[in-house]
Design a protein with these regions (language model features):
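Active-site neighborhoods and metal-handling regions in enzymes and metal-associated proteins
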Residues: 1-390
Length: 390
């Protein structure tokens, strides 16, 4: 499915149809979108993705009943036309980086163009959804008298259910990550730093088309407890655990989020690590069959939360599971503080656990990715497990 095997025009058409239906379901005639994940979803991939995460240089106006309009930087319009058949216009930059003290003025000009498109369609008096943007954008739209509503829930719920083509991409991206992890294991030897090991894992992923990772979560030895410590200059020793979370956004912008813990070298890793690994691995694989369509998020949280061994609850991971798409996204399955909703076929979910005793010397992270179907969940991540710890 990677590369030329994906019909990006059809992919875009399927996603747009879902977004437009979501707008209709929420009685929202239009939304102006700046979040790169949402813009990509209703139009096409952009360039400079990581920069776009903090700099709003492209946006889209999507309508419930009309074709969307994409505003693209002039230098990128040619690339966008190869991916998107709809209307594309050059942007009026308004970021402070590009506009300086003219930022507010430029934002007013850009949003006046958006407002004109609402007006000609008879939508200027209705609500306009918005996901996120710089303050100057909100001020400009407020100055035009636009009634803004939060479009993030609308788009996140739409994105949570994947089309068949999206599911195929998720499967393929997971396979590529599995292959990257297998190749990475050939380089997991004592004497290398965490930085070197993370670089090797990313090298193996990027050679298969990965776009970026959401984190640098790789730790070793005592830095595996507590979790969430990113790669450092620590030199990995014989017998150390090495734990990582891929958080990899792969080809076509779809996330493969899996975690593994391995033993580096030949020395005995010790009972503390074995116990932690068995607990994390066992929790995840015993939980996966519970992820069936119709199960509410609350039911899953209340069912699975008590299954985590008491010895590891003080430092448990905040999520039991979460949705995957353009990033870690809706829904989140938690122990408490549940939100409404239920699993549906087409959701892509990562199920995870961290096990490390409070005050302990090591810990283990384990995570798998699954597809929710009309029957049993489909496991799509198959990176090797650490047999020496089972």
């Amino acid at each position: 499915m990677t590369g030329p095997g994906v019909d990006v025009r059809e992919l875009g058409a399927q996603r747009l149809a879902r977004a437009q239906q979501a707008l209709r379901d929420h009685d929202l005639p239009a939304a102006v979108l700046f979040d790169p994940a949402d813009v990509r979803y209703v139009t096409c991939d952009g360039s400079y993705l990581v920069a776009n995460l903090h700099c709003s240089y492209r946006w889209a106006l999507v309508f419930a009943e009309h074709d969307p309009i994409l505003w693209e930087p002039t230098e990128s319009i040619g690339l966008a036309r190869a991916r998107y058949a709809g209307e594309i216009r050059p942007t009026t930059s308004f970021t402070f980086f590009g506009s300086g003290d003219h930022s507010a003025e430029h934002a007013r000009a850009a949003m006046a163009e958006v407002h004109d498109e609402l007006r000609v369609r008879g939508l200027a008096g209705g609500p306009l959804g918005i996901d996120r943007a710089e303050a100057v954008v909100f001020l400009a739209l407020a100055g035009l008298g636009v009634r803004l509503v939060d479009a993030t829930p609308v788009l996140e719920v739409a994105r949570a259910i994947k089309t068949d083509l999206e599911l195929d991409i998720h499967r393929d991206n997971a396979r590529l990550v599995d292959e990257a992890v297998r190749r990475f294991l050939d380089h997991l030897v004592p004497g290398r730093t965490e930085h070197e090991l993370w670089a090797r894992l990313m090298y193996e992923a990027f050679t298969t088309g990965a776009l970026h990772s959401e984190s640098r979560l790789l730790s070793s030895g005592p830095r595996t407890n507590p979790w969430m410590q990113e790669a450092s200059a620590r030199v990995v020793q014989d017998g150390d655990p090495v734990a990582f979370d891929t958080d990899l956004v792969g080809p076509h912008g779809y996330l493969t989020d899996v975690s593994r813990t391995y033993v580096c070298g030949d020395a005995d890793p010790g009972r503390e690590l074995r116990d932690a690994y068995r607990a994390a691995h066992g929790f995840v694989h015993e939980a996966i069959p519970e992820f069936r369509a119709g199960r509410t998020f609350r039911e899953l949280g209340e069912l699975l939360g008590p299954r985590l061994p008491a010895a590891y609850r003080a430092q448990r991971y905040p999520f039991l599971a979460h949705g995957c798409g353009a990033a870690d996204e809706y829904p989140a399955i938690v122990v408490d503080g549940h939100h409404d909703g239920a699993l549906e076929p087409g959701m892509v979910i990562s199920v995870e656990a961290y096990c490390g005793r409070e005050g302990g010397t090591v810990g283990a992270k384990f995570e798998e990715q699954i597809l929710v179907t009309s029957g049993a969940p489909e496991l799509i991540s198959h990176a090797p497990v650490e047999d020496r710890l089972l």
